[in-house]
């Protein structure tokens, strides 16, 4: 019989949908039969309230094949005109070592992992992060460092907040900012200070530090215009007032310059972009945050520490986790959860690959080229603002500023205008002698009349950095920076670290509320295109036409997926999206002349919600949940009656973190709107909504969108993320602005929430690719299959572990909560025991004890097929059988596969085995493990020991052997 497929079908423009979605049609039918429903449509009807379901498909273009999407995006990228940028201001051209590019940035073993909450299967990433902390403490001269922040500007804002927290002796409400800080840093700090109620002074330290009263001050080192001030003296002045001294430092300059820690700084922040991370039109990049040990419990962000496992072997873990927002909620040090793990480890590997000598050589080359440029400009008659500098010159040019800028543009060069009458030039590791010749030609008004060898001779003879400014000895002297200088050794080291971790290239990661879905290769390819990576974030927007068009298209795509009218791409993490959304609400009410301070937050909310509300200076009022896990309407009514027109917003996650679609969501929205307040719908669970229901249509005024969840940006082992916000029309005029790039429709008074205008712009192509290849049909199918997979797991496990919450028809949303409390009471087995035992089956654990203590929250996503779901369910059922044996006395409560989990190769290779179960039961409890197994490299880690004996820098190399 002849095949009658149409030619259109043979082109298979929608084939990516079946690549992204795990179950095939045969598996779908089997899973639906297990659920006793006839079709996916019937399942959705029984799961999602009819009042919110969309009747029409999403207004998106038809899906296209992978190669077509890549061609379309390549044509957009080609519209970016990448000039040579000497703009500086915290962003510089750099070279990513190819061994790191290929084996880390382009490697799913690194970019698809999750935050290392289960350290026994994350020792590789943890070692990379410990290396990062070692690098930062070495370069800054500080006692400790955290494991990265989102960007330099938000790190500065976090340092300001920390200065207020720890400065108990100082009652001032004022903070001092060096006027030579980067403009984007000043803007973000002003925004944060406004909502904390801090007063801000921006002035020259040499003029104003001694006479002002403040609880903290930040100094830029070197300054934005390249000058190097009397940092040590200024630090002493600040500390004489019982205020904290914060230094924002350029990481490359610290290779040569005296460290801020050596000069007495309390906190040192900055950005690691120069250490092998592309500019990417603003990100993503890893910021650093270093501090004195006495402030460790007041520090934001994650800290990696050294501990021991149950066999006494050295092991790494995230230390002092009780500081984090998901535990302390509105009392947390910060709302930040995602940081920039992937970029942090890349920068550490950059330092390790080059080593102390190589990094020193790069820094000295940059400095000598800068001295040569200074000699050339002086010989042409130009006046330099500073005679002391590292890599940046500020040239006083008077009324020649515009002609020089025009001349530079003609030569495809970007310079930086420093106010009126001055230009700055920042050199980088990519600067060559030919570049110097081109720069001098711009200032000479024609071909360079200068001879490079003579300029070099002058530069070598002239010392612009006095001895008291230079570092005493080389930085990066720890052994880890002298081990891996050949590509062979670095390649093997990176592979060793990768092999110690479980990422999506090994198995499903069923973390609830995290959406660990496929990060398709086609989506990742554009991230490393030079047209995207080499663009300076403050280059004229006319040079970034491709980016601008891609932003516009992505904003329309995200608006279509959510039902909102406007999208801001600036927030570079979900936490920052929450903060930006709440500030938008505040600005809206300010414009109306209304003062509202209450934020209602359901008991089940993400811990980030109350932390974000507190940062926005809102008072958190908790709304109770009923016995079914839904918002308690009676309690909501009582809180509305009590606070009325003082309510600014409610923050509600939908579907809820309890894993159900609440039937009364529209009723909740109506009640909030009735008192003039706004509805913030947390977008963490959008993966169950896209194409099915739109928050902008069923009552939401604003939502943040976790692009690293629903829209396929990978988690990177703990970052990068992206958290743009969608708003309805009435909130659009109040979206975040930026001091250095015009964002259409915004004004400066709205404030700034991220260092870069469009956040981590270079990873936005990932979400663009995903939506373009899925189209309306695929986006809806992704949500439907996510719901199908979660319900299949719930059905298979419910006779073994109680499902805590479900909807009125007995179905869950895209995730489900297993209630382990009865088992714990009967057997003594904890949720941690089960999480560690899952490692022996090759799985990362679900989310533990959130949002309810004593539970596991499971989210399989649409990308996993029935085989993988069954593999996970079989593991959980086998674990339940082991618990039954403990309950019945067949296994001792203190010696069984759960309390001893996870088991390592050291365990099974040891000549002694004195346990109540066999080695096979320990390590190969199911048959599939005989064919392939991912081994934990350490046994269960001692958390208490690690916090009591806090070590956050690298041990000696011998300790790793």
UniProtKB/Swiss-Prot annotation:
GO molecular function: glycine binding; glycine dehydrogenase (decarboxylating) activity; pyridoxal phosphate binding
EC number, UniProt record: 1.4.4.2
Needed co-factor(s): pyridoxal 5'-phosphate
Keywords from the UniProt entry: Oxidoreductase, Pyridoxal phosphate
SUPFAM superfamilies, A to Z: PLP-dependent transferases
Record PTM N6-(pyridoxal phosphate)lysine, positions in chain: 709
GO cellular component: cytosol; glycine cleavage complex
GO biological process: glycine decarboxylation via glycine cleavage system
Broad enzyme group: oxidoreductase
Alphabetical list of HAMAP family matching this protein: GcvP
Similarity comment: family membership: Belongs to the GcvP family.
Subunit relationships: The glycine cleavage system is composed of four proteins: P, T, L and H.
Described function: The glycine cleavage system catalyzes the degradation of glycine. The P protein binds the alpha-amino group of glycine through its pyridoxal phosphate cofactor; CO(2) is released and the remaining methylamine moiety is then transferred to the lipoamide cofactor of the H protein.
Protein name per Swiss-Prot or TrEMBL: Glycine dehydrogenase (decarboxylating)
Organism of provenance: Teredinibacter turnerae (strain ATCC 39867 / T7901)
Lineage: Bacteria, Pseudomonadati, Pseudomonadota, Gammaproteobacteria, Cellvibrionales
């Amino acid at each position: 019989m002849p095949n009658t497929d149409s030619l259109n079908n043979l082109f298979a423009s929608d084939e990516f949908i079946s690549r992204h979605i795990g179950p095939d049609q045969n598996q779908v039918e089997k899973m639906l039969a297990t659920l006793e429903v006839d079709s996916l449509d019937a399942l959705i009807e029984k799961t999602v309230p009819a009042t919110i379901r969309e009747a029409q498909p999403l207004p998106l273009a038809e899906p296209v094949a992978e190669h077509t999407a890549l061609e379309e995006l390549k044509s957009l990228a080609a519209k970016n005109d990448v000039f040579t940028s000497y703009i500086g201001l915290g962003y510089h051209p750099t070279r990513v070592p190819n061994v790191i590019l290929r084996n880390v940035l382009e490697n799913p073993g690194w970019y698809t992992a999750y935050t290392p909450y289960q350290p026994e299967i994350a020792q590789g990433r943890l070692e990379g992060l410990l290396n990062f902390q070692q690098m930062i403490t070495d370069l800054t001269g500080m006692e400790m460092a955290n494991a990265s922040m989102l960007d330099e500007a938000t790190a500065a804002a976090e340092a300001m907040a920390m200065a207020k927290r720890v400065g108990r002796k100082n009652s001032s409400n004022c903070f001092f900012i060096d006027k030579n800080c980067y403009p984007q840093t000043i803007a973000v700090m002003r925004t944060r200070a406004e909502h904390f109620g801090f007063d801000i002074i921006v002035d020259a330290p040499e003029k104003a530090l001694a006479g002002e009263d403040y609880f903290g001050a930040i100094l830029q080192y070197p300054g934005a215009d390249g000058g190097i001030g009397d940092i040590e003296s200024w630090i002493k002045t600040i500390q004489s007032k019982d205020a904290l001294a914060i230094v924002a430092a350029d990481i490359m300059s610290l290779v040569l310059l005296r460290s801020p820690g050596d000069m007495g700084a309390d906190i040192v922040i900055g950005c690691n972009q120069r250490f092998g991370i592309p500019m990417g039109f603003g990100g993503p990049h890893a910021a650093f945050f270093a501090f004195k040990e006495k402030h460790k419990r007041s520090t934001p962000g994650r800290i990696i520490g050294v501990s021991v496992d149950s066999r006494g072997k050295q092991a790494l873990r995230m230390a002092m986790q009780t500081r984090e927002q998901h535990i302390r909620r509105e009392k947390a040090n910060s709302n930040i959860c995602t940081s920039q793990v992937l970029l942090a480890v890349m920068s550490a590997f950059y330092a390790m690959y080059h080593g102390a000598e190589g990094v020193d050589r790069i820094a000295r080359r940059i400095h000598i080229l800068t001295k040569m440029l200074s000699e050339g400009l002086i010989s042409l008659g130009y006046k330099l603002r500073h005679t002391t500098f590292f890599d940046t010159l500020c040239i006083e040019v008077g009324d020649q500023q515009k002609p020089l800028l025009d001349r530079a543009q003609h030569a495809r060069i970007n310079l930086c205008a420093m106010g009126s009458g001055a230009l700055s030039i920042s050199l980088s590791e990519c600067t060559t002698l030919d570049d110097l010749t081109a720069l001098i030609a711009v200032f000479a008004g024609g071909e360079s009349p200068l001879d490079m060898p003579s300029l070099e001779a002058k530069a070598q003879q002239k010392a612009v950095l006095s001895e008291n400014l230079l570092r005493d000895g080389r930085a990066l002297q720890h052994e880890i920076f002298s081990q891996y200088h050949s590509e062979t050794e670095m390649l093997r080291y990176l592979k060793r670290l990768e092999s110690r971790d479980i990422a999506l290239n090994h198995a499903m990661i069923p973390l609830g509320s995290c959406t660990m879905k496929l990060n398709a290769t086609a989506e990742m390819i554009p991230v490393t295109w030079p047209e995207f990576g080499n663009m300076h974030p403050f280059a004229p927007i006319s040079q970034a036409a491709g980016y601008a068009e891609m932003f516009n298209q992505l904003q329309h795509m995200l608006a279509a997926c959510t039902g909102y009218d406007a999208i801001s791409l600036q927030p570079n993490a979900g936490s920052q999206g929450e903060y930006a959304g709440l500030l938008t609400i505040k600005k809206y009410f300010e414009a109306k002349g209304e003062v509202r301070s209450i934020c209602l937050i359901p008991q089940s909310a993400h811990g980030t919600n109350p932390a974000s509300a507190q940062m926005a200076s809102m008072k958190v009022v908790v709304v109770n949940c009923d016995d079914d896990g839904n918002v308690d309407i009676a309690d909501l009514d009582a809180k509305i009656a009590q606070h009325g027109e003082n309510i600014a917003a409610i923050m509600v996650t939908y579907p809820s973190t309890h894993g159900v679609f609440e039937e009364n969501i529209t009723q909740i929205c109506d009640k909030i709107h009735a008192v003039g307040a706004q509805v913030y719908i947390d977008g963490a669970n959008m993966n169950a909504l896209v194409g099915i229901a739109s928050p902008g249509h069923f009552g939401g005024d604003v939502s943040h969108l976790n692009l690293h969840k629903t829209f396929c940006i990978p988690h990177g082992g703990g970052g990068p993320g992206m958290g743009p916000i969608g708003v309805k029309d009435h909130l659009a005029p109040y979206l975040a602005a930026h001091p250095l790039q015009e964002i259409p429709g915004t004004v400066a008074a709205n404030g700034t929430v991220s260092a870069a205008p469009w956040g981590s712009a270079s990873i936005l192509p990932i979400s663009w690719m995903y939506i373009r290849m899925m189209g309306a049909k695929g986006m809806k199918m992704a949500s439907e299959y996510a719901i199908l997979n979660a319900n299949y797991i719930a059905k298979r496990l419910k006779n073994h572990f109680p499902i805590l919450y479900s909807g009125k028809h007995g179905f869950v949303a895209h995730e489900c909560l297993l209630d382990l409390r009865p088992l714990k009471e009967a057997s003594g087995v904890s949720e941690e025991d089960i999480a560690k035992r899952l490692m022996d089956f090759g799985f990362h654990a679900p989310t533990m004890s959130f949002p309810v203590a004593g539970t596991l929250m499971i989210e399989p996503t649409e990308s996993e097929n029935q085989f993988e779901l069954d593999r996970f369910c079989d593991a959980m059922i086998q674990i339940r059988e082991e618990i039954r044996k403990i309950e019945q006395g067949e296994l001792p409560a203190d010696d069984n596969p759960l309390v001893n989990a996870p088991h390592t190769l050291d365990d099974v290779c040891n000549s002694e085995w004195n346990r109540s179960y066999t080695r096979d039961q320990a390590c190969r409890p199911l048959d599939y493990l005989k064919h392939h197994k991912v081994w934990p490299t350490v046994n269960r880690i001692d958390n208490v020991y690690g916090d009591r004996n806090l070590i956050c820098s690298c041990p000696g190399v011998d300790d790793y052997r």
